[in-house]
Regions:
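Short, solvent-exposed coil/turn segments at beta-strand boundaries
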Residues: 29-30, 46-54, 70-73, 110-117, ...
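Bacterial N-terminal signal peptides
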Residues: 5-15
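C-terminal partner/receptor-binding element of secreted or periplasmic proteins
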Residues: 124-141
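Contiguous, well-ordered beta-strand patches that form the walls/edges
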Residues: 38-41, 58-115, 124
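N-terminal helix-cap/turn-to-beta initiation motif at the start of protein domains
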Residues: 19-34, 47
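Secreted/processed peptides and extracellular or luminal domains of membrane proteins
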Residues: 48, 100-101, 127, 135
């Protein structure tokens, strides 16, 4: 029975999405980014780390997520980003919302050729996007 149990556990592990697959060290997303939201008088800071986790500060909210991001852009020029919130301090973000642990999101990133900014879109078009996210010097948030 043990070999069968081990085989089932191995199959389950293989079937899981590669949520822990860290991006390459040269991935353009890694680093600290700021999204300014002037109409709300607020900004959000995103720190995408090399271990596949991110730390976000938005108004009073501080949250942590696990993410996966495509290594290369699609033929349309977008990087697919999948994100799952794993920690949150329960405080309101810039929009007045409170993020729920376990929330998942899939977005598509389009980088400026300079690599210094990107927009985050609902799909692989420029029809529903937020940004620009501006790269910041490496520092803690």
């Amino acid at each position: 029975m043990r070999p069968l149990t081990g085989l089932l556990l191995l199959a389950a592990a293989i079937a899981q999405p590669a949520a822990s697959a860290a991006p390459s060290a040269s991935h353009p997303l890694l680093g600290i980014w700021v999204l300014s939201i002037p109409q709300l008088g607020c900004s959000e800071t995103y720190h995408f780390r090399g271990d596949g986790t991110s730390l976000v500060k938005s108004a009073e909210e501080v949250s942590e997520s696990e993410f996966t991001v495509a290594e290369k852009p699609s033929v349309k020029g977008f990087y697919k980003l999948e994100d799952r919130v794993v920690k949150d301090n329960g405080k309101k973000d810039c929009s007045g919302e409170i993020m729920q642990i376990g929330s998942r999101a899939t977005n598509y990133l389009r980088f400026h050729p300079s690599g210094a900014r990107f927009v985050m879109c609902q799909d692989e078009s420029m029809q529903a996007c937020i940004g620009p996210f501006e790269r910041m010097p490496a520092q803690g948030i």
